[in-house]
Regions:
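Short loop/turn motifs that connect adjacent beta-strands in outer-membrane beta-barrel proteins
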Residues: 7-8, 85-93, 159-163, 213-217, ...
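Extracellular loop and loop/strand-boundary signature of outer-membrane beta-barrel proteins
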Residues: 60-64, 109, 188-192, 230-231, ...
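Short "repeat-start/strand-capping" segments in structured domains, especially the N-termini
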Residues: 95, 165-167, 217-218, 241, ...
């Protein structure tokens, strides 16, 4: 219907279409439209659609996706007020009262460039006002399955590419993730990551603006959290659990505030500052990057950490050793000349006590410099029980004798070495 309203001018005009619908071969479309105040239009729209993707693929002649099938149901209600003289203001307030419901059922397709088909994709997501909620996003790829749910507290801020911080939270889980199958370049290849995860769960949170996320020259700028991570690995026969992390990323620097977790019964705590991390991402880096780090653990069982693929990499007499009250502090500097040219690592604190051998590491530290396949060990010191030592060394690891720049040299100074202990 159409009415010019009580005032009989454009401010009171109303226009409405109710229950309009269409049934093309692709599916069913219906909706309602109501517009009032033609000077500053107040628009209410409801759209409901249910269509089949295989028809759309044929109709649009989509060649990059094969065997596309599935159903999509989309419901949209939105209310917007448009200022004709200042339309940019209405864009700023778009979706003040907005509702969208998306349901995808049994979506499947094959990308010619990838050897695995995506199948059984089911999605249910709702956007109400500014907040978006993903009830479920379930998919199967090859032997792997993935389930995602989550929330975005201000989706329009992302759509409009604003500088406002948006908080996103995701819960990701999987019964089985076959990383080798997923990362291999072809069906018969074994060039991918040879690992598989089972009973995996991961909680992630991000606090970043859409602008910082997409326009950062390096990694997305913002604060990122691992709320929880647990998994069982196929070739690393240990239970990873209670992982948590807080990472702050700036344009050129990043700060790992706290990274904690457990491997079976072993725990770890790590924090650090990374300056000019962008060097690691450049194809031909030039310059220096630095790391300052702390590592600590109440208990580390060596057999928990250094066993992989059925092989134990710890000497037999130390396989059941346990390090208690471990504390490490150090810093590293890496110099790049189109590639990594040299690495300098200094450990100024290393303390721990061994449970089986009844020894304590005290006052351990030193400097290690690696350059051109040459390793320089400078003032590496330590005290273990009644033994106290100081080591300096120059070692060459290059295989080309013509490029060898120095003879190997090791210096050991000890006030006492108690081999019995």
């Amino acid at each position: 219907y159409f009415s010019n309203g009580e005032k009989r001018d454009i401010t009171s005009m109303e226009f409405s279409i109710s229950n309009f619908s269409a049934k093309p071969d692709a599916g069913v479309f219906s909706g309602d439209l109501h517009v009032s105040n033609f000077l500053e239009p107040d628009i209410n729209v409801k759209l409901v659609s249910n269509f089949k993707l295989e028809f759309l693929a044929k109709f649009l002649n989509i060649e990059d996706i094969e065997d596309l099938a599935g159903d999509v149901e989309l419901t949209m209600n939105f209310h917007d007020i448009i200022d004709i003289e200042h339309p940019e203001k209405s864009i700023e307030k778009l979706n003040e009262s907005y509702f969208t419901e998306l349901k995808v059922t049994n979506l499947s397709f094959q990308v010619p460039e990838y050897h695995l088909a995506l199948k059984d994709l089911d999605v249910y997501a709702v956007m109400d006002g500014h907040a978006a909620n993903i009830d479920y996003f379930d998919v199967k790829i090859g032997n792997s399955d993935l389930h995602i749910s989550g929330t975005v507290d201000d989706l329009p801020a992302i759509i409009h590419h604003t500088s406002k911080d948006v908080l996103t939270h995701l819960e990701i889980s999987s019964n089985y993730l076959d990383l080798l199958e997923l990362t291999s370049p072809s069906k018969d290849s074994i060039e991918g990551i040879n690992e598989a995860l089972s009973n995996m769960s991961l909680g992630l949170s991000f606090k970043s603006s859409a602008k910082d996320f997409t326009e950062s020259p390096n990694l997305p700028i913002g604060e990122f959290f691992i709320d929880d991570f647990q998994a069982i690995l196929k070739h690393y026969p240990h239970n990873l659990h209670d992982f948590h992390a807080d990472l702050i990323i700036e344009e050129d620097n990043m700060k790992l505030v706290d990274f904690t977790g457990m491997v079976d019964k072993s725990d770890f705590h790590f924090d650090g500052k990374f300056t000019h991390y962008e060097m690691w991402l450049q194809e031909r880096p030039q310059g220096d990057t630095k790391i300052d780090f702390n590592f600590s653990s109440k208990m580390i069982q060596l057999e928990d950490i250094f066993t992989y693929g059925g092989e134990n990499f710890v000497p037999e007499e130390y396989r059941h050793e346990e390090f208690d009250d471990l504390i490490v502090h150090g810093f590293a500097a890496m110099h790049f000349k189109e590639k990594l040219y040299s690495t300098d690592v200094t450990i100024d604190l290393f303390e721990a006590k061994m449970k089986v051998h009844h020894l304590r590491f005290e006052d351990f530290g030193g400097r290690f410099h690696l350059e051109n396949d040459d390793l320089l060990i400078e003032d590496f010191r330590g005290t273990m029980g009644r033994s106290k030592f100081l080591v300096n060394a120059e070692l060459g690891f290059g295989t080309d004798t013509l490029l060898k720049t120095q003879d190997n040299h090791i210096s050991l100074i000890a006030s006492k070495l108690d081999f019995d202990q």
